[in-house]
Amino acid sequence: MEDSTEDIIKSFTLEQSPEIKPKPKSKTSDLTDIVYAMDDDSIKMKKFTIFDDKYDQNISDSEHDLTPIKRKRQSAQSAPPPPATKFSSSIPQKPTLSPKKLATSPTKNYTDHINQLRSGPNSPKKYQDDENIRSLKYEIKRLKQEQNLKLENLQHKIDYLTNERDELQNQLTSMSFENDKLTKKNRSLSHENNHLTLENSKLKTKEYSNEELQSENNKLQRVNSTLRNERDELVKDFNITRDKLKKYYDLYLHCQKAHAKEMKKRIEVDGDKPISDKPMADNSTNQELVDVLKKLSEMMIEQKKISEPSAAVEKDTTSEDKTPPIPNTANSSDTPRMVSDFLEDFIKRVFEEMSSNNKNTLSPKQAINSQTYSQPNNFSNNTVPPSQSAAYNPSNSQPAPPPQPATNFYSSSTPNTNGYNQSSQSDERPETFELPHVAKDHWLQRPTSERSTQSTKYMKMDPEDIRKLVSVITDQLKKEQKSEKPSNVVEMETPVEKCQCCHGNPRNVTDTNNNQKLCQSCLNKGDFTMSEFMGRSN
């Protein structure tokens, strides 16, 4: 019986509640979890009710009585229990209990008796109910703990998210500042872009003008190149003319020395012969020449007085003006030749100016030349410097008086235009033959009315005086040609040259009747002689 009771007690023991598996996370509230737990408890209660119904019919009421049960001892004659099979230990067997009567009288109704037993403190039903309540309390505690853990986790998550939110807020503020800066930059760039578009449109409109400027630039570059070439050519021509000037100056010195030697020879040969025996010009002719020269000198003085206030010509500070020495006038027959040489050059210039005045027009170049006529070059087709010839008196008997400012055609105030001292008669060559000093022409800066009156006043001359002057000069030249050289002077052979302008034909350069002159190519070569230089005036 003890074994059977133990088995029955074991059958009524409560099973341990299985571990509740974690339910999937859902968005429902905590009440849903409690509902799930209640459902599990209801399932367990159903199991216990089935077990009670199954074992109520076999259990007698005497076993549940608190009074001790009197059992009889088994006799030896009683049959032994059946042999145990090999599966009897594992299979629970129901106890074979026979209903026994209690000492007390049973209740009137069986159901009431069962209910009375169940309502007792030691009844399995009561124990089961207590266990269910106890399990629910434990479950509630467990759920509370889980809920607290979840709340803590959620609180940590909330803190973490708040920190992240603060960081993001700070980043958002910084990004907002950056966004403001970028918007400002975008605005400035947009304004700059608009400005550049306008400039681009302007440049597109100016492309045509740029092309024109480029074409003009190209033209100016071409003109500049041509001017440089012309300048190089002019420099070459200047070098050539400088070399020629040196040769002419050497030739002039040679002629001066030869003339002095010739004068000495004539004085030695002639001896004490009277001067009247030598060929001389007539007194009347010389007197006419003197009158004409006086008129010309008066006109030149008037022109000089007019031109002094305008300061048309600047003084050449580098050149030293020296008074020319008075040449020897022992032989009065040389005087007409000097005068004729000077007048020949002067009359040629007068005729050129008259021909230009007949056209009633004066170019600037001619106007400049009209001023230079009062200042002729020192070595233009003259064998003797004109400063010497101006100091002579054309009379036959009396020597020349000292030069006076009224009759001096080449005063010391006249600027030097040849690059060396025009009055020097020394044998030394000049150190430099550079470009001549060209004074600033103030005559062209005057009004046209003043220029016209002055030019006409300067060139205004009586035709009778001009005719008389021309006739006197021609007669004097004829007399010079007829005059022969002394017998004791050996006549030089006339050089014969060929020139390209003459087509290779021989030409007598000293022939006065021949009007042929050297061409430019011959002059560039520098092929000239003393006799040719003397005959250039023809």
From Swiss-Prot:
Q: Basic and acidic residues: which segments have biased composition?
A: 18-30, 57-68, 304-323, 426-444
**One of the GO BP terms on file:** mitotic spindle pole body organization
What broad class describes the main subcellular location of this protein? cytoplasm
Coiled-coil segments, which residues? Answer: 144-237
Q: Where is the composition biased (Polar residues)?
A: 86-96, 104-122, 355-392, 407-425, 446-457
* Domain of life assignment: Eukaryota
| Localization in the cell | Cytoplasm, Cytoskeleton, Microtubule organizing center, Spindle pole body
Q: Does the keyword Membrane apply?
A: no
The phenotype of cells or organisms lacking this gene is: Leads to an elongated mitotic spindle. Restricts localization of TEM1 to one spindle pole body in a large proportion of cells. Increases the level of CSE4 protein in the cell. Cell cycle arrest at the late anaphase/telophase stage with segregated nuclei and 4N DNA content. Simultaneous disruption of BUB2 partially suppresses the cell cycle arrest phenotype.
**Keyword set, alphabetical order:** Coiled coil, Cytoplasm, Cytoskeleton
Please give the residue ranges the record annotates as the region Disordered: 1-31, 57-129, 304-338, 355-458
List cellular component terms (GO).
cytoplasm; mitotic spindle pole body
State its role: Plays a role in mitotic spindle pole body organization, possibly at the point of spindle pole body separation. Required for mitotic exit.
- Its name, as the record gives it, is Spindle pole body protein CSA6
Biological source species: Candida albicans (strain SC5314 / ATCC MYA-2876) (Yeast)
